[in-house]
C-alpha cells in the first residue's frame, strides 16, 4: 500500500508510476479534504483499490451518512475511531453496506482506529482515560469486534495481544 500524503499533482504522478506495480493507495485527510471525491475517482480510474483514511468520529447518524458517501465514491476501505462506540461503528457499517448494494460495489472494509500512535499513557490521562495504552487498545478493539466491523488498526506492538484476545482475523 502506498500512502499518498502529498498534493494531488504528485499523487497523480505517483499513480501513473505505480500503475501495475501496486494495488492499494491510501488517501488521507489532507489530500481528500483538498480535492474531495475526485481524488478517489482518479485512483479508481487508474485501477487502484482505495484505502480512504478519514478516521470518522461523530454521532451515528452523521457517520452512517459519511460512510455511505465514501463507499458510494468507490472507497474500498474506510476508517473510524472506535472510541465513538459500538452504535457509531454499526452505523458506519450500515452506510457502507447500503452504498455498496445501491452502487454495485464490493462492501468496503471498515477498520477501527483504537488509539492514535501519537498517543501514550500521558496523553490518555490528559483526556481523562485512566487505563494504560495496552488496556485501552484492548477495550476499543473488543468494541470494534462487538460492532461487527472488519478489523482494527493498531501498532505492531499490540498485534499479538489483539490476536490472542480477538482471534487470528
Segments predicted by a language model, with ranges:
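N-terminal glycine-rich anion-binding loop in soluble enzyme alpha/beta folds
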Residues: 1-21, 97
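Active-site beta-loop-alpha junctions enriched in small/polar residues
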Residues: 3-7, 28-32, 57-59, 83, ...
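Catalytic domains of carbohydrate-active enzymes, especially glycoside hydrolases
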Residues: 17-26, 73
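Anion (oxyanion) recognition and catalysis
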Residues: 19, 44, 104
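Conserved beta-strand positions in the central sheet of alpha/beta enzyme cores
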Residues: 23-26, 51, 79, 153
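Active-site cofactor/substrate anionic-group-binding motifs, chiefly glycine-
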Residues: 26-29, 40-59
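Conserved anion-binding
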Residues: 62-66, 71-150, 155-160, 165-169
Amino acid at each position: 500500500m502506498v500512502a499518498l500524503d502529498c498534493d494531488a499533482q504528485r499523487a497523480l504522478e505517483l499513480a501513473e508510476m505505480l500503475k501495475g506495480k501496486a494495488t492499494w493507495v491510501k488517501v488521507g485527510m489532507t489530500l481528500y479534504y483538498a480535492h474531495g471525491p475526485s481524488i478517489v475517482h482518479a485512483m479508481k480510474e487508474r485501477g487502484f483499490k482505495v484505502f480512504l483514511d478519514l478516521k470518522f468520529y461523530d454521532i451515528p447518524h452523521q457517520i452512517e451518512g459519511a460512510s455511505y458517501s465514501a463507499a458510494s465514491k468507490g472507497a474500498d476501505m474506510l476508517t473510524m475511531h472506535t472510541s465513538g462506540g459500538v452504535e457509531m461503528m454499526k452505523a458506519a457499517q450500515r452506510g457502507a453496506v447500503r452504498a455498496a448494494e445501491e452502487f454495485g460495489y464490493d462492501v468496503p472494509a471498515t477498520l477501527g482506529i483504537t488509539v492514535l500512535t501519537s498517543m501514550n499513557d500521558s496523553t490518555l490521562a490528559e483526556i481523562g482515560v485512566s487505563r494504560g495504552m495496552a488496556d485501552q487498545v484492548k477495550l476499543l478493539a473488543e468494541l470494534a469486534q462487538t460492532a461487527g466491523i472488519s478489523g482494527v488498526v493498531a501498532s505492531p506492538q499490540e498485534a499479538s495481544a489483539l490476536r490472542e484476545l480477538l482471534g487470528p482475523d
